[in-house]
Regions:
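Active-site activation/catalytic loop segments of kinase-like enzymes and analogous catalytic loops
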Residues: 108-152, 168-183
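A structural signal for short hydrophobic/aromatic patches embedded in well-ordered alpha helices
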Residues: 52, 142, 161-162
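Protein kinase-like catalytic domain
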Residues: 3-10, 147-150
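All-alpha amphipathic helical-bundle segments outside canonical DNA-binding/catalytic cores
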Residues: 154-166
Length: 183
């Protein structure tokens, strides 16, 4: 409902964190980290850099569609995760918190980032990767619930690319954290 309530708000709202969910920018940061290899760790993670680069063009789809005039930016929370939702004692949603990241972005931002935390079977910082998986039941339930209110303002292209959004945010976090690790 957060996005539905803001669907008609003009996107002139300022960008609070420049390029926060800009995949092309995040890949450029990774490429700079790889080129500089400040911490001398590149050799041990080169395989992961190669995997990320192999998917880079696909993962920059949002920025490409926007440049082509096919995908608009909307007002988004840009840090949608379970920890940023307050619930009452019965488990009902009271409100969304942590509003310092509310700014124009692609609809993929809120949909994909929420699933990154909600559909993860492990903890966000889980050290045991055997605990980490993607819960398709949560994805399906969330997508159905999301579309009940969002289908009135989403374009067919946005709806078609919601599964892309679910893949984008784990990818983006990997790119961000790997750049930090290499630096």
């Amino acid at each position: 409902n957060f996005q539905a309530m803001l669907a008609d708000v003009p996107t002139e709202l300022g960008e609070t964190i420049k390029d926060f969910h800009n995949m092309e920018f995040r890949l450029q940061q990774l490429r700079e980290a790889v080129a500089e290899n400040k911490a001398g760790r590149l050799a041990e993670v080169q395989w992961l850099v190669d995997e990320l680069e192999a998917r880079a063009e696909e993962m920059c789809k949002g920025e490409r569609l926007h440049r082509e005039g096919k995908l608009a930016k909307r007002i988004c929370h840009c840090d949608t995760k379970v920890d940023n939702i307050l619930f009452d004692a019965d488990g009902n949603v009271l409100c969304v918190i942590d509003l310092d990241t509310v700014m124009p972005n692609f609809i993929f931002s809120d949909f994909g980032d929420f699933l990154r935390s909600a559909a993860n079977t492990g903890r966000e910082d889980d050290k045991d990767l055997d605990n980490v998986n993607f819960n398709m039941d949560i994805f399906k339930a969330f997508a159905e619930g999301y579309l009940k209110s969002a289908k009135v303002f989403l374009t067919p292209l946005e709806i078609e690319n919601l599964p892309y959004a679910a893949a984008l945010f784990p990818y983006m976090q990997t790119v961000r954290f790997l750049a930090d690790y290499i630096n």
